[in-house]
Amino acid sequence: MSPSLGLSYGGSWHLQRSARQARCSTRSGLPIRPCTRRGESSPSTSATPTPASRGQTQTMFQLCIPSWVAFADDGAVLVGEDARNHAAVNPQAAVSGFKRLLGKRLTRVLEREFGQRVKENLSYKIDVDKDVWPHIQVTTSDGEVRLLGVEKLTAMVVAKLKETAEAYLGHRVEAAIFTLPLEFSDEASRGAAFFTGRLAGFEAMRVLSEPTAAANAHGVDERLRDEGSVVVLHVGGGTAEASVLTLVDGAYEALGLEHDPFFGGQDFDRRITDHFVGLVRSKHGKDIGGDGAALDKLRTACERAKKTLSHQDHARVTVESLVDGVDLAEPLTRAEFEELNHDLFLKVVELVDKVVSQARDYYMDSKLVIDEVVLIGGSTMIPKLRELVRDYFGGTKELSTRIKPDEVVTIGAVEYSKWIYSKRRSALLARRELS
């Protein structure tokens, strides 16, 4: 039986493969059904490998690459870090953030508001007239203009993961589990995920919702009372989502959902960057607000400092030759970072409050009890953000953080992979017995 990989699609694509899966030993696992709103099917797009036991990854292979695609002047397609670096050379030939458009039809009345936000927040031009589905315009240095579908761009990233995994393992990998945010719960998004898998050379075995995958990675179903509830909060690099899930007859269903496709860790980075742009102006007399190259270097340094402050009280923002011979080397404390982003952190809490209110409305009264809170995404590792979420629930709810938030969805898809292989193996043995 061909082994599969786990792919989690966020601001970056994550790929994991466990040692146990590589040995192709017999697998047992938990049936993880796709999370659904009542009466609806709900997709998600992620593919992951199977760890030896729940919560223990024992990973022999793991890869994470940014969701960037670029086109060099010689016609070469660049993916991941290479593509992001090329953006500094020719920003019109590099794109990112296209996950938000997967399966979307911006000409539909229900998606016009989203379409307007796309125009306001994404720097590249989007053509909505070609084949109904949105196509992204890229322009190389020689002036060549290309229109590329979102599925094709996404498949380029997935194919890069597939190629890297096969080179490492020494054999073909043909199957994957995909995960998508719960917001992508329509058949168009689900179909786009399967189509992306086929373009990349994968059999997309299943499409899961990220909240379901994360909850099952933590084994929430083993502790949750019947019809108990869990809040799943996802704050990634560029998107944020909060949902309330309930467990009914062993399956997760969604009681509420709040999704912001243009809010996340990049907003925190921007606040720090703006702070240091002002500092450079006042201290060195240089205005780098219109200098794209300098801003990119500063933004990268600020993001690095932000991550450091998740586990340290102090960090330094260091950029050599920022502009006109100016070397930047300035301290940034966790307290300063929290002050700069306080209102944005409260925006995350507001997301949680809205989704909890939706869940209470479902019950038509206030009997809703939240049993657990699961965190997804690298931005949820920020200590102040965790503190505010914990305080929202009166300090009585421990946040499920045993598994790293930026890996938990991938591991949840791995668990589902185990179950699929177990079912297929059981079916194969049953057929052999009958014959």
Which sequence ranges carry the predicted segments?
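Oxyanion-binding/catalytic loops of NTP- or PPi-dependent enzymes
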Residues: 2-116, 128, 139-151, 156, ...
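Short amphipathic beta-strand and strand-loop transition segments with alternating hydrophobic
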Residues: 121-128
